Amino acid sequence: MEFKHISVLLNECLDALDIKDNGIYVDCTLGGAGHSSHILERLSNEGLLIGIDQDRDALKAAKERLKRFENVKYVHSNFYDIDNILQNLDIPKVDGILMDLGVSSYQLDEGARGFSYMKDAPLDMRMNRDNDFSAYEIVNEYSEDELYKIIRNYGEERFAKRISNCIVNRRSDKPIETTMELVDIIKAAIPAKARREGPHPAKRTFQAIRIEVNSELKILNQTIEDGVNRLKPGGRMAIITFHSLEDRIVKLKFRELNDPCTCPREFPMCICGKKPSVRLVSRKGIEPTKEEVEENPRSRSAKLRIIEKL
């Protein structure tokens, strides 16, 4: 299957990174290389792009798309490892870092990956298929309380208690093996009126399980910190999020780096000695235009936040 993915907030990201033609840039979520191909077009032969992705299919597609460029290094890894990756490449500092935290259209549309609640497939949801831990283990082995907590916390699902209870009851008969089995269980757990209103009834639960499988939120804070430490002064970090949980983490971390002072508010001056390491380029998240949402409905919930290293 062709690796299709429409780059979200493309022009906004390119502007955000303030690309220098001889700079070094890291795309932490290379995917189909939509953003990266445009970054490379702005680089001279002295510039360099480092593309990281934990999905081998994505790396293969990116190499094909970027084959005309020689100034690219490909890394099969999780962006959580950005510090070691740059150390191994003997690159102390970079000019820009991009993270697109969305699931690619390819991953959603290829049924076999198990990300979609619209297509039947084995319960998987692994971004990195070299890992053993998948959605199957979560659905069939987590306790009811553990299921409840991830569905509530990562999916912000108001019927988390009912859904986790239904999952545990159903799997007592036989293991839950496919996405459609799970969808049916979720639908049965949610009241009919709620099913008829709002998004697909399985959307939030699938999001929660995917986040847990890939440790998406657990690694984000540390990755931002490590990335900022690797930026040159004036270097920029741009992060695209697609749901409120991610955006909240990014927003709060950016604010903390911009204002790390821990002194009580009533103190007339700072005595803790903690200095800002970044400035906020965008105070508010940048959202797609109406035109972009019409062309690519999956961009609707996207939000871009940008910081610059001091």
Curated annotation (Swiss-Prot):
Its EC number is 2.1.1.199. It is found in: Cytoplasm. InterPro entries: RsmH, SAM-dep_MeTrfase_MraW_recog, SAM-dependent_MTases_sf. S-adenosyl-L-methionine binds at A33, G34, H35, D53, F79, D100, Q107. Transmembrane segments: none annotated. It catalyses: cytidine(1402) in 16S rRNA + S-adenosyl-L-methionine = N(4)-methylcytidine(1402) in 16S rRNA + S-adenosyl-L-homocysteine + H(+). It is an enzyme of class 2 (transferase). Pfam families: Methyltransf_5. One of its GO terms (molecular function) is rRNA (cytosine-N4-)-methyltransferase activity. It comes from the Bacteria. One of its GO terms (cellular component) is cytoplasm. Keywords: Cytoplasm, Methyltransferase, rRNA processing, S-adenosyl-L-methionine, Transferase. One of its GO terms (biological process) is rRNA base methylation. NCBIfam families: 16S rRNA (cytosine(1402)-N(4))-methyltransferase RsmH. Specifically methylates the N4 position of cytidine in position 1402 (C1402) of 16S rRNA. Belongs to the methyltransferase superfamily. RsmH family. PANTHER family: 12S RRNA N4-METHYLCYTIDINE METHYLTRANSFERASE, S-ADENOSYL-METHYLTRANSFERASE MRAW. This is Ribosomal RNA small subunit methyltransferase H.
